[in-house]
Amino acid sequence: MAARRPRTAPEHESDDDSYEVLDLTEYARRHHWWNRLFGRNSGPIVEKYSVATQIVMGGVTGWCAGFLFQKVGKLAATAVGGGFLLLQIASHSGYVQVDWKRVEKDVNKAKKQLKKRANKAAPEINTLIEESTEFIKQNIVVSSGFVGGFLLGLAS
C-alpha cells in the first residue's frame, strides 16, 4: 500500500488524500502460495533437486499414500460388505422388509440431484484439472515416482 503523509487536524476533513489500489488477484498470480509459506528461495522441485532425489521423494510419498489407501480401503470394504451381509441375513430372516419401489424412486431422485450439481460444479472441476495437469507437467519426475510408489504401496 502507498504510504500516507501524516495528517494534522485541519487536513483531516480534506478529500485530497490519494491511495494506491492493489489488485489481489494479480498479486496472487505472481506470488505462488509456496513463496508465501516457505519464502522466496523455495520454488519448483525441478530447480532444487537432482533427478534421482526427485524420484526417491516421489516414490516414498507415493508408497506411503498407497499403503494408507490400501489399509483404509480394506477397512472400508470390510465395513460396507459386512453391513450388506447383515442386512441380507436380516431380510431373509424376515426382520427387515424392503420397499423396492420407494428405493427406486429415491435412487432416481438422487441421480437427478447429482446431475444438477455436476453441471453447476463443472467450471471449478475443470480449473482444478487444469491446475493438476500443469503441476504434473512441471514436475514429471516427482509425479512418475509418486505413481510408481503409490502402486507399490497398494501391492504391499
Swiss-Prot record:
Q: How does it sit in the membrane?
A: Multi-pass membrane protein
Q: Which Pfam families match?
A: FUN14
The answer to whether UniProt assigns keyword Chloroplast to this entry is: no
Chain location of the short sequence motif YXXL per the record: 19-22
Q: Alphabetically, which GO biological process terms does the record hold?
A: autophagy of mitochondrion; response to hypoxia
The entry's cellular-component GO terms read:
mitochondrial outer membrane
Its keywords, alphabetically, are: Autophagy, Membrane, Mitochondrion, Mitochondrion outer membrane, Transmembrane, Transmembrane helix
Segments crossing the lipid bilayer: 49-69, 76-96, 135-155
Task: Report the subcellular localization.
Answer: Mitochondrion outer membrane
- What InterPro entries does the database record attribute to this sequence? FUN14 (IPR007014)
Give the protein's biological function: Acts as an activator of hypoxia-induced mitophagy, an important mechanism for mitochondrial quality control.
| Family that this chain belongs to | Belongs to the FUN14 family.
Any idea what this protein is called?
FUN14 domain-containing protein 1
Per the UniProt record, the lineage of the source organism begins with:
Eukaryota, Metazoa, Chordata, Craniata, Vertebrata
Name of the gene encoding the protein in the UniProt record: FUNDC1
